[in-house]
């Protein structure tokens, strides 16, 4: 087994035989990808039309680098993006399945210096840790906290119906913290991957009565995303759900989960 660390600061172990080792400059190139897949599952085709040969299937969250095209090619291929795959091949993906990457993936190099994640990311972006969230919100949402919160909730809803998979972080299966951290990531803010609040990351505890849409609700070993009006979205392994569903904090709501309400112990916010 090999110990690995993801670009969002998550440590784990992988069977070494499943890894492909590359030079650091190749990794830098990959981490400079400018597009992220937002469709649940999307084919990469050999041609910019549905008759193209299927080269591979990608999942939500996969990143790609757009390849340059001439003005004539771009016009002829309207509705499609020419992308570079990790194996060096190029293919085509529908534009509607892609969005700009809103998060920075190179802080992993600064983490080698022993910096906390926020400090490592700030060093990479040539800023300070306290400015990470305001700058992300300013860049992608015009400085509007409400717009950011709404976007996080919408990103989480895209996973509705996805089955629960412990350790999962894709449209094929996702766990509770995978759902919440992915929703934030797609909106430009990297939070801690597990179901807890720790120092060195953007999220901090706020009073329950101050919770707003987009905040995180913490239970022992579990986390959900608050949607507003008493409802929250989460990925749960409960037998009655088995995936991403919406439940409620309100006893009068048919989606009420009393077992979770009783053990809710913290609300987390990045604001």
Where are the model-predicted features located?
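Second-shell loop/turn segments in exported
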Residues: 138-143, 163-171
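Low-complexity, Gly/Ser/Thr/Pro-rich intrinsically disordered linker/tail segments
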Residues: 250-271
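Well-ordered beta-sheet/strand-loop patches within structured domains
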Residues: 111-113, 117, 144, 151-165, ...
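Short, basic/aromatic beta-hairpin or loop at an interaction surface
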Residues: 30-44, 183-198
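Short, flexible surface segments
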Residues: 54-62, 212-213
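Active-site nucleophilic cysteine motif
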Residues: 156, 168-187
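...with weaker cross-activation on analogous glycine-rich loops/strands in unrelated enzymes
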Residues: 189-252
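Boundary regions of SH3-family modules and the immediately adjacent low-complexity/disordered segments
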Residues: 1-2, 6-40, 49, 53-57, ...
């Amino acid at each position: 087994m090999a110990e690995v660390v993801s670009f969002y600061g998550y440590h784990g172990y992988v069977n070494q035989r499943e890894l492909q080792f590359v030079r650091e400059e190749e990794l830098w190139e990959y981490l400079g990808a400018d597009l992220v897949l937002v469709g649940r599952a999307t084919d990469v085709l050999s041609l910019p039309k549905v008759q193209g040969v299927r080269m591979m299937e990608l999942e939500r969250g996969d990143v790609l680098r757009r390849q340059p095209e001439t003005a004539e090619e771009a016009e002829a291929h309207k509705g499609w993006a020419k992308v570079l795959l990790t194996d060096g091949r190029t293919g085509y993906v529908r534009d509607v399945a892609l969005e700009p990457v809103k998060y920075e993936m190179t802080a992993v190099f600064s983490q080698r210096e022993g910096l906390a994640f926020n400090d490592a990311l700030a060093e990479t972006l040539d800023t300070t840790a306290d400015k990470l969230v305001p700058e992300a919100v300013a860049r992608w949402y015009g400085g509007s906290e409400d717009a950011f919160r709404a976007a996080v909730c919408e990103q989480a809803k895209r996973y509705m119906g996805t089955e629960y998979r412990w350790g999962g972080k894709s449209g094929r299966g996702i766990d509770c913290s995978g759902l919440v951290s992915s929703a934030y990531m797609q909106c430009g803010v990297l939070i801690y991957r597990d179901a807890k609040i720790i120092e060195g990351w953007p999220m901090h505890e706020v009073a329950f009565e101050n919770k707003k849409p987009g905040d995180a609700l913490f239970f022992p070993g579990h986390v959900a995303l608050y949607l507003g009006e008493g409802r929250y979205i989460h990925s749960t392994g409960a037998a009655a759900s088995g995936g991403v569903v919406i439940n409620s904090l309100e006893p009068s709501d048919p989606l009420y989960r009393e077992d979770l309400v009783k053990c809710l112990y913290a609300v987390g916010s990045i604001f």
